[in-house]
Amino acid sequence: MTTFRFCRDCNNMLYPREDKENNRLLFECRTCSYIEEAGSPLVYRHELITNIGETAGVVQDIGSDPTLPRSDRECPKCHSRENVFFQSQQRRKDTSMVLFFVCLACSHIFTSDQKNKRTQFS
């Protein structure tokens, strides 16, 4: 969240300025030349949050993709041991690496932990 700083002498807005001699960030009033040191060298931070699904890009013929690794993990739905797997497409700090398996027999999507089962896609 962006915060504005104001001059303690004239109440006008303070603007960021670089102190090139000491290599530090300052805030300066353009009206009365009041200067104060910034607590942090960060002026602005823009965090991008994407909202793509965990299984984005899964299509019906995913099993014919030769670039995907194969696994013999048992499908919890049909008990087949032929599947492909891929990593979750969510790239956020708060998510851990999740592997998704797609059964080649029934197209069921599941993860390595059996609690997080996925349904069949069309």
UniProtKB/Swiss-Prot annotation:
Keywords: DNA-directed RNA polymerase, Metal-binding, Nucleus, Transcription, Zinc, Zinc-finger. It comes from the Eukaryota. InterPro entries: DNA-dir_RNA_pol-M_15_CS, Rpa12/Rpb9/Rpc10/TFS, Zn_ribbon_RPB9, Zn_ribbon_RPB9_C, Znf_TFIIS. Zn(2+) 2 binds at residues 75, 78, 103, 106. It holds the Pfam family Zn_ribbon_TFIIS. It is found in: Nucleus, Nucleolus. Component of the RNA polymerase II (Pol II) complex consisting of 12 subunits. PANTHER family: DNA-DIRECTED RNA POLYMERASE, DNA-DIRECTED RNA POLYMERASE II SUBUNIT RPB9. DNA-dependent RNA polymerase catalyzes the transcription of DNA into RNA using the four ribonucleoside triphosphates as substrates. Component of RNA polymerase II which synthesizes mRNA precursors and many functional non-coding RNAs. Pol II is the central component of the basal RNA polymerase II transcription machinery. It is composed of mobile elements that move relative to each other. RPB9 is part of the upper jaw surrounding the central large cleft and thought to grab the incoming DNA template. Involved in the regulation of transcription elongation. This is DNA-directed RNA polymerase II subunit RPB9. It comes from Candida glabrata (strain ATCC 2001 / BCRC 20586 / JCM 3761 / NBRC 0622 / NRRL Y-65 / CBS 138).
